[in-house]
């Protein structure tokens, strides 16, 4: 089979270009739902100096790294050189990997409890899906190495391995996680189930009309 070679023109330009122009659609989306303005209303950890980035800028920049394929902090650095993408999202400068790690390390369990249930509720207010079905479940996640918070406990698939034993709440209609608590692997299935359900209904889903609740055995053992 003969293949005809096509001569493609090569041109040079002094204009900035990006391989991620399609993300402009995401920019329109976040502008439409007003999520950046909503983030400004939450008490996120503040920078250590007046020259630091606003929390909403750090979060938006972190999203850009994830949307362009980053799976490690260091990968987010490539977005710092994409001036077109920064212009699309209205960012004058972008944080370094150390800024992300410092910001995320400031979150404590107390701070998480103050912010994320209310943030989840804000998100679910945007979903017009009528009455919802909420599924509660717990699962075992096997961990390898020395993962923070992991411990040896009930693990039917990898006996003797460290694990986490999280509690999860899902919206059945959308398959979206409504709430999640990460627990050590040596935690009993029913531990903190009632408190978890209260937070889910009273905070994360306070604006939704719940029509049906389904639970696994671990949740029913507590009552």
Task: Outline where the language-model segments fall.
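Acidic/histidine-rich, metal-coordinating catalytic segments
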Residues: 137, 209-220
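Alpha-helix N-cap/loop-to-helix initiation residues
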Residues: 189, 220-221
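Dynamic "connector" segments at or just before major functional cores
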Residues: 1-209
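A short acidic (Asp/Glu
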Residues: 145, 221-223
């Amino acid at each position: 089979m003969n293949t005809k070679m096509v001569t493609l023109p090569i041109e040079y330009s002094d204009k900035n270009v990006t391989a991620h122009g399609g993300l402009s659609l995401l920019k329109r989306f976040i502008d439409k739902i007003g999520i950046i303005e909503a983030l400004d209303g939450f008490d996120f950890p503040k920078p250590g100096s007046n020259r630091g980035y606003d929390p909403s800028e750090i979060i938006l920049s972190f999203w850009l790294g994830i949307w362009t394929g980053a799976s490690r902090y260091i990968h987010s650095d490539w977005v710092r050189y994409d001036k077109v993408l920064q212009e699309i999202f209205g960012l004058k400068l972008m944080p370094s990997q150390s800024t992300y790690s410092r910001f995320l390390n400031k979150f404590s369990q107390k701070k998480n409890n103050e912010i994320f249930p209310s943030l989840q509720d804000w998100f679910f207010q945007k979903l017009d899906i009528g009455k919802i079905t909420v599924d509660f479940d717990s699962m075992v996640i096997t961990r390898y190495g020395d993962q923070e918070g992991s411990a040896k406990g009930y693990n039917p698939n990898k006996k003797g391995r460290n694990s986490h034993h999280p509690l999860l709440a899902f919206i059945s209609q959308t398959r979206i996680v409504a709430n999640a608590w990460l627990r050590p692997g040596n935690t009993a299935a029913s531990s903190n189930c009632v408190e978890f359900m209260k937070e889910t209904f009273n905070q994360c889903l306070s604006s939704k009309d719940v029509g049906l609740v389904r639970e696994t055995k671990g949740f029913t053992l507590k009552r």
